[in-house]
């Protein structure tokens, strides 16, 4: 069926009425009166558990949310994506990051062309190159083994590889991986400073080989290599992820060190492609293929499971409920796993660049809020930074906890148990809170004077009823990481379909690039600032004055 705008609007109205009148208000009571609540509001895919029972939903909520997904034609849009249709309508492109990890199908067609042989060819070339670097068969210009790789990219060419490489640290042997993204010269200076050009490989990740931040840093790195080893050494110390073969050749990188990808792969969905080359070098081709396999398992589940048993669909529906119906403008991603410390930033781009839109697929203003602000830090660090606001602040911010049942350090299992206890305790505390009577009783148990009890007790009250969901997997390994990232990719897709927006363009990013290009000659003093707004003129003048001081 097609998207039914009338039915969708009516279901949204029913959801808003339900939220105002009959959604759970007291989560303690919801659990105490309903022993089956956890069982009904949780799902598993193998070892991966998704629990949303602490969110303020009941059976009526879930029935209406399923009705919403049907009216929005989530299933039809999903089928169109997997079929290679051009669902990115503003750029007239297919959206097929799922093909990058598909090892089971015989064909996936884009405009009549089977892309799977192309994907396999690039993946096999990546594996051969990664094995060559890791084994020492591919050496630097002086004959030394490569000990360090530096990936230069930005946005999707950086956030995914950084996140995945850090997450899979237990699977590293060598070489060491470093990442440069910011145009700020301090970033590349600090990265290159302790390294030796003779044992360093630099990967330049830019599809067009024109991204200003990436190419500026690449030229700096090229000079660093050439000044020490000579111009002839450049080719042995660089590789590129790009489709602009002429520009790559002009830079000095041989064609056999260039790895391409396709316009049906968006930047923030590209870690599965050649953009993942630094990840593959760091953890090895076998582990990278397990990473792809985990994502593919989630793809198959998302494609085939019925709506009410589908993890990405249910995660997306809860996300929509929190954003559009409950009115929560933010969501916090809290992985209780230090190696997932860059996951919140990765999901921030995935979600906010995808669903930070204000017009519908047909170019009309949206009728309600779209993507939330996404942010977070790993636990337990976040508990000592911003959890105060999450517990007692005036805004309700849903949390998404992620934790593994087992850590990678068997001799430190007691610390992992403490980590898990903190995760579950925060989830419970946000839901249950603490009443004024409980706060009084706690203080009275310390034999404090009655006047002090009455003065302090209100400060120790927690409203509770603050929603959170929890994802638990066995262990953070390549397969589990791939599955987790694919879960969030498809969740973004589901929310976008209900919002009625295009999750696969990013025109807001392009605007900033255009203005930065225009302002560079002004900031460098080659052009005047006249014609700019008064604020920009004043800022430029101040910068010029301080640079001369």
From Swiss-Prot:
Keywords on record: Cytoplasm, Gluconeogenesis, Glycolysis, Isomerase
Single Gene Ontology MF annotation: carbohydrate derivative binding
A GO CC annotation given for this chain: cytosol
SUPFAM superfamilies documented for this protein: SIS domain
EC number: 5.3.1.9
Superkingdom, taxonomy of origin: Bacteria
Compartment(s) of residence: Cytoplasm
Catalysed reactions, semicolon-separated: alpha-D-glucose 6-phosphate = beta-D-fructose 6-phosphate
Bilayer-crossing regions: none
Function text: Catalyzes the reversible isomerization of glucose-6-phosphate to fructose-6-phosphate.
Name of this protein: Glucose-6-phosphate isomerase
């Amino acid at each position: 069926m097609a998207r039914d705008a009338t039915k969708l609007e009516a279901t949204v109205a029913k959801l808003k009425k339900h939220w105002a009148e009959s959604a759970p208000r007291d989560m303690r009571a919801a659990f105490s009166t309903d022993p089956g609540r956890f069982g009904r509001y949780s799902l598993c895919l193998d070892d991966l558990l998704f629990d949303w029972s602490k969110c303020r939903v009941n059976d009526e909520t879930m029935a209406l949310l399923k009705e919403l997904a049907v009216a929005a034609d989530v299933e039809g849009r999903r089928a169109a994506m997997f079929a290679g249709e051009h669902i990115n309508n503003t750029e007239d492109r297919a959206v097929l990051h799922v093909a990058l990890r598909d090892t089971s199908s015989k064909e996936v067609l884009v405009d009549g062309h089977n892309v799977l042989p192309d994907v396999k060819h690039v993946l096999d070339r990546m594996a051969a190159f990664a094995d060559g670097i890791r084994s020492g068969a591919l050496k630097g210009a002086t004959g030394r083994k490569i000990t360090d790789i530096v990936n230069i990219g930005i946005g999707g060419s950086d956030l995914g590889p950084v996140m995945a490489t850090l997450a899979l640290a237990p699977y590293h042997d060598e070489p060491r991986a470093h990442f440069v993204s910011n145009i700020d010269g301090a970033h590349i200076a600090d990265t290159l400073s302790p390294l030796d050009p003779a044992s360093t490989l630099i990967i330049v990740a830019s599809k067009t080989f024109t991204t200003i931040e990436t190419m500026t840093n690449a030229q700096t790195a090229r000079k660093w290599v050439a000044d020490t080893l000579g111009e002839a050494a450049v080719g042995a110390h660089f590789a590129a992820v790009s489709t602009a073969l002429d520009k790559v050749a002009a830079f000095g990188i041989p064609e056999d060190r260039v790895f391409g990808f396709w316009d049906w792969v968006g930047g923030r969905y590209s870690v599965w492609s050649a953009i993942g080359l630094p990840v593959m070098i760091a953890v090895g081709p076998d582990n990278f293929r397990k990473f792809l396999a985990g994502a593919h398992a989630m793809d198959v589940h998302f494609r085939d499971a019925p709506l009410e048993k589908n993890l990405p669909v249910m995660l997306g529906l809860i996300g929509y409920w929190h954003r559009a119906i409950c009115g929560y403008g933010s969501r916090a991603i809290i992985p209780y796993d230090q190696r997932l410390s860059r996951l919140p930033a990765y999901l921030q781009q995935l979600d906010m660049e995808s669903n930070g839109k204000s017009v519908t697929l047909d170019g009309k203003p949206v009728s309600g809020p779209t993507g939330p602000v996404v942010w977070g830090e790993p636990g337990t660090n976040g508990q000592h930074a911003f959890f105060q606001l999450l517990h007692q602040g005036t805004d309700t911010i849903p949390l998404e906890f992620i934790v593994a049942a087992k850590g990678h350090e068997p001799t430190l299992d007691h610390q992992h148990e403490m980590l898990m206890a903190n995760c579950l305790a925060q989830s419970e505390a946000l839901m249950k809170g603490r009443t004024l009577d409980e706060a009084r009783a706690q203080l009275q148990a310390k034999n404090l004077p009655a006047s002090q009890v009455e003065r302090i007790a209100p400060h120790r009250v927690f409203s509770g009823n603050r929603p959170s969901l929890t994802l638990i997997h066995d262990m953070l390994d390549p397969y589990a990481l791939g599955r987790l990232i694919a879960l969030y990719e498809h969740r973004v897709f589901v929310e976008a379909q209900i919002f009625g927006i295009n999750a696969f363009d990013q025109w807001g990013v392009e605007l900033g690039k255009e203005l930065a290009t225009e302002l560079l000659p002004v900031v460098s003093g080659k052009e005047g600032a006249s014609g700019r707004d008064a604020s920009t003129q004043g800022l430029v003048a101040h910068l010029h004055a301080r640079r001369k001081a």
